[in-house]
């Protein structure tokens, strides 16, 4: 049976580095953010839902979603964020299940789901185990500012839009603190894989 490991954490905590580590091990990664991104392309399901519910002012001239403008709205207005999530999360969930089923012949599949708990995927029993990657908030803010070219305030608002990392850690099966080098993170991930294979 395939072991589905949900990978979550906060923004800029090191999930992409973990993804790359697993891909290098030939372990398939189902990326919920990529699925969400694809569904937002013109004429796709999320695109239609956003256009119908938020209006054409959130579209660019080429009909793509103005992600920056939509982001500014939802990361500053919890009601708008909740509305967006209610529209898109069921669509993302259906596509995610389809993707996971494609890898039924694999021992392990990684489900990269940044908002795993926020979107109630834990209630749907979609994964066999949940890994949370944590990071001190000051480091998280600095990484996010550099990566996304955000102000201090914008970075803090994005972090606050997600469930606190310490709460996610309490709900997880495995917790890795990403406080060192990439090599140290990879060593911790390697140990986790060994543990899962031994228990599986």
Swiss-Prot record:
Pfam families noted in UniProt: CoaE
Instruction: Give me the residues that bind ATP, please.
Output: 12-17
Q: Which InterPro entries would you find in this protein's record? A: Depp_CoAkinase, P-loop_NTPase
Gene3D superfamilies assigned to the protein according to its UniProt record, in alphabetical order: P-loop containing nucleotide triphosphate hydrolases
Pathway involvement?
A: Cofactor biosynthesis; coenzyme A biosynthesis; CoA from (R)-pantothenate: step 5/5
Q: Where is the signal peptide?
A: none
Occurrences of domain DPCK (ranges): 4-200
- The answer to whether keyword Cell wall biogenesis/degradation applies is no
Q: Which cellular component, as a GO term, is one annotated location?
A: cytoplasm
Recall the GO molecular function terms of this protein's record: ATP binding; dephospho-CoA kinase activity
Q: Which domain of life is it from?
A: Bacteria
Query: What sort of enzyme, by top EC class, is this?
Result: transferase
State the PROSITE patterns in the record.
DPCK
Per its record, the protein catalyses:
3'-dephospho-CoA + ATP = ADP + CoA + H(+)
EC number of this enzyme: 2.7.1.24
Keywords for the protein's UniProt record, in alphabetical order: ATP-binding, Coenzyme A biosynthesis, Cytoplasm, Kinase, Nucleotide-binding, Transferase
Q: What is a biological process (GO) this protein takes part in?
A: coenzyme A biosynthetic process
Q: Main site of residence?
A: cytoplasm
Family, similarity comment: Belongs to the CoaE family.
Q: Which NCBIfam families does the annotation name?
A: dephospho-CoA kinase
Function statement: Catalyzes the phosphorylation of the 3'-hydroxyl group of dephosphocoenzyme A to form coenzyme A.
What is the name of this protein? Dephospho-CoA kinase
**What is the organism field in this record?**
Lactobacillus acidophilus (strain ATCC 700396 / NCK56 / N2 / NCFM)
């Amino acid at each position: 049976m395939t072991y589905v490991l949900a990978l979550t954490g906060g923004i800029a905590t090191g999930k992409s580095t973990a993804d790359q580590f697993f891909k290098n091990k030939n372990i398939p990664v189902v990326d919920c953010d990529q699925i969400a991104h694809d569904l937002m392309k013109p004429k796709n399901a999320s695109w239609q839902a956003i256009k119908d519910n938020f209006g054409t002012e959130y579209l660019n001239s080429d009909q793509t979603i103005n992600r920056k403008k939509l982001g500014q709205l939802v990361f500053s207005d919890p009601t708008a964020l909740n509305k967006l999530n209610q529209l898109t999360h069921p669509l993302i969930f259906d596509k995610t299940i389809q993707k996971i089923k494609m890898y039924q012949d694999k021992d392990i599949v990684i489900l990269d789901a940044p908002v795993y708990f926020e979107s109630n995927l834990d209630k749907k029993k979609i994964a066999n185990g949940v890994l949370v990657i944590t990071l001190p908030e000051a480091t998280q803010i600095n990484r996010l500012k550099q990566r996304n070219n955000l102000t201090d305030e914008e970075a803090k608002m994005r972090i606050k839009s997600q469930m606190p990392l310490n709460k996610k850690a309490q709900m997880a099966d495995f917790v890795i603190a990403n406080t060192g080098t990439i090599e140290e993170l990879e060593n911790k991930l390697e140990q986790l894989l060994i543990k899962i294979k031994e228990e599986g």
